[in-house]
Amino acid sequence: MKVLRVNLDEKSYDIVIQKDLKDYFGEYIKTVFDGKKVAIITDDNLNDIYGEAIKKNIENEGFEVEVISVTPGEKSKSFSILPGIYNKLLDFKLTRSDLIIALGGGVVGDLAGFVASTFLRGISFIQIPTSLLAQVDSSVGGKVAVDLERGKNLVGSFYHPQLVLIDPNMLGTLPEKYFNDGLGEVIKYGCIKSKELFEKLEGFKNKEDLKENIGEIIYECCNIKRELVENDEKDLGERMILNFGHTLGHAIEQIYNYETYSHGEAVAIGMNMISKIAEEKDLTKKGTAERIESLLKKYGLNTDVNIEDNGLAREAIKLDKKNLNGNLNVILLKDIGEGYIYNTTVEFFE
């Protein structure tokens, strides 16, 4: 078992990483929550696989549990879904002294966290991430949000969980496409902050070799994010480097209506494209983009998409949350493991 402490004064919490942790979720929940009712927000796929077993596991600790399930996919992270969830919580008579659990990938984590931050002006929640992307990235750091038609994560808040429970064995039920989704974010951590992690990923023989070491990889990624979040909770400084590849990535997701490319796949393409642009402008060490592209291809990730001459891309980039008063903070690399913030404008991409 590995435990990381995210130190944020009264908002501090633990990240617990352990194989087969799902058999002990109820016991861990009891260490941070002494209320009565627990509402689990999940999606239909995960509910079919884990819903009943996890519900019983938590009930065995004396809690009253209700499961609320949504349709899988990014389109559930919208305002149209919220009233139905709020009403189910009201029917369950959930109070501010009760608990919400986010059981799922990045979409469920963002959605359930946003619900927790807004229902009754905020109630406690716990993250139980089940996808690689959520385990290494989105479950840690307190960012919760829903999408608008004009872009991703445009309405949200910083709202930290009480606890993050990560069972790497739950990745065994994950379709390969969504494992790849998380690999995009894993590679990102190596790019921005850890040359050692990047070289470790280069050194694995293949994806199966990586999977055998996945607990260690999850820990390293969470530890990098923990450090960045502690130093810059509200994402106004160094934490921004976590958005490497995301400016173009979000634009790609939006252009393809969140259907063709998953978040991690789009970020992988964004990292590759931005590195090539930065090298051409002498803002990144020569050869860096080639190493990134090679590593992405090694793990079966897409590296390019044609968004040239597409006005939608420009509009999507304008809505990027790193676009402040017309100035766009783009995340670039000096070299592998050395991310930095570069202040520019949308014209950077033209």
Swiss-Prot record:
<keyword id="KW-0028">Amino-acid biosynthesis</keyword>
<dbReference type="InterPro" id="IPR016037">
    <property type="entry name" value="DHQ_synth_AroB"/>
</dbReference>
<feature type="binding site">
    <location>
        <position position="263"/>
    </location>
    <ligand>
        <name>Zn(2+)</name>
    </ligand>
</feature>
<feature type="binding site">
    <location>
        <begin position="130"/>
        <end position="131"/>
    </location>
    <ligand>
        <name>NAD(+)</name>
    </ligand>
</feature>
<dbReference type="InterPro" id="IPR056179">
    <property type="entry name" value="DHQS_C"/>
</dbReference>
<dbReference type="GO" id="GO:0000166">
    <property type="term" value="F:nucleotide binding"/>
</dbReference>
<dbReference type="Pfam" id="PF01761">
    <property type="entry name" value="DHQ_synthase"/>
</dbReference>
<keyword id="KW-0963">Cytoplasm</keyword>
<dbReference type="GO" id="GO:0009423">
    <property type="term" value="P:chorismate biosynthetic process"/>
</dbReference>
<feature type="binding site">
    <location>
        <position position="152"/>
    </location>
    <ligand>
        <name>NAD(+)</name>
    </ligand>
</feature>
<keyword id="KW-0456">Lyase</keyword>
<dbReference type="InterPro" id="IPR030963">
    <property type="entry name" value="DHQ_synth_fam"/>
</dbReference>
<keyword id="KW-0520">NAD</keyword>
<keyword id="KW-0547">Nucleotide-binding</keyword>
<dbReference type="GO" id="GO:0005737">
    <property type="term" value="C:cytoplasm"/>
</dbReference>
<dbReference type="InterPro" id="IPR050071">
    <property type="entry name" value="Dehydroquinate_synthase"/>
</dbReference>
<keyword id="KW-0479">Metal-binding</keyword>
<comment type="similarity">
    <text>Belongs to the sugar phosphate cyclases superfamily. Dehydroquinate synthase family.</text>
</comment>
<keyword id="KW-0862">Zinc</keyword>
<feature type="binding site">
    <location>
        <begin position="106"/>
        <end position="110"/>
    </location>
    <ligand>
        <name>NAD(+)</name>
    </ligand>
</feature>
<dbReference type="GO" id="GO:0008652">
    <property type="term" value="P:amino acid biosynthetic process"/>
</dbReference>
<dbReference type="GO" id="GO:0046872">
    <property type="term" value="F:metal ion binding"/>
</dbReference>
<dbReference type="GO" id="GO:0003856">
    <property type="term" value="F:3-dehydroquinate synthase activity"/>
</dbReference>
<comment type="pathway">
    <text>Metabolic intermediate biosynthesis; chorismate biosynthesis; chorismate from D-erythrose 4-phosphate and phosphoenolpyruvate: step 2/7.</text>
</comment>
<dbReference type="InterPro" id="IPR030960">
    <property type="entry name" value="DHQS/DOIS_N"/>
</dbReference>
<dbReference type="Pfam" id="PF24621">
    <property type="entry name" value="DHQS_C"/>
</dbReference>
<keyword id="KW-0057">Aromatic amino acid biosynthesis</keyword>
<comment type="function">
    <text>Catalyzes the conversion of 3-deoxy-D-arabino-heptulosonate 7-phosphate (DAHP) to dehydroquinate (DHQ).</text>
</comment>
<protein>
    <recommendedName>
        <fullName>3-dehydroquinate synthase</fullName>
        <ecNumber>4.2.3.4</ecNumber>
    </recommendedName>
</protein>
<feature type="binding site">
    <location>
        <position position="143"/>
    </location>
    <ligand>
        <name>NAD(+)</name>
    </ligand>
</feature>
<feature type="binding site">
    <location>
        <position position="185"/>
    </location>
    <ligand>
        <name>Zn(2+)</name>
    </ligand>
</feature>
<keyword id="KW-0170">Cobalt</keyword>
<dbReference type="GO" id="GO:0009073">
    <property type="term" value="P:aromatic amino acid family biosynthetic process"/>
</dbReference>
<feature type="binding site">
    <location>
        <position position="246"/>
    </location>
    <ligand>
        <name>Zn(2+)</name>
    </ligand>
</feature>
